[in-house]
Amino acid sequence: MKNNKLHRTGQPDGQHHNTHLVYHLQHLISTTPLNTTRPEPYRTHQHLAHAELITTARKTIAQLARTQHPYPNHIPNRYYRHFQRYFDPDAAFQHLFRHTLHAVPTDHPYTIALDGTTVPRTGAYIPGAHWTPNPTNAPFARGLRKAQRFVMAGWLDDDPNARCVPIYWLPTFSPKARYANPTSRRSEIQGWIASLQHIRAWLDAAGRAEQRLLCVGDGRGDTQALGKLELPNTVCCVRTRKDSRWCDLPQGTPSGRGRRRV
């Protein structure tokens, strides 16, 4: 009964601007048709969608489930079963990508940001989890934590105040990670390249083969593997040094101090 009260939609009072957004989001979630024969999967989908939109800094299913009232001490298995057989992440990302095309004219570049991220894990048998430096520790007391590593590709809108919309999420598990699928073991740069290839293929499939794809990344992309990537109508911009590894140094160039700039 308390969960039903949380999702109850009412007309906004007109005094607070945030109530209009919450009302429309709740109305959209409650009226979205799903091909389910039982009410439990439909309510589970509503709970997760509401938590994903309303709460911030929630990345895992367990974190989303804990936002529901009453707060469960043990996460029910229905939240995990909801994605085991019926959820295709690639199809979901491509569906979200198609919805961003209406905001990008064909004569403008489709801009994405590529960056690596880690998701903290505490389980002992989670595939791909490995020990990484813990950024929450103090500088004078460095420690480790278990986490999964991913590469996120986010679409950037022309509005300077807009946040990026994640349109692709690719695992980049360490080669030494236990219980991981061999196809998920890759470096971060390999994840960047695979993400660019997927998004370029989506643009081509949408009839936008001539549209330019602009990729923006940080200094981790300063590698020859990304600098020599040949994709049609694709441009990559990353932060580089004066002696960037994107460039092939001339043969016979003296090394050490006093080396000529290239």
Residue ranges of model-derived segments:
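Active-site-proximal, Lys/Arg-enriched surface segment
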Residues: 51, 82-167, 171-173
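Short, conserved catalytic/metal-binding motifs centered on acidic residues
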Residues: 64, 109-122, 153, 213-222, ...
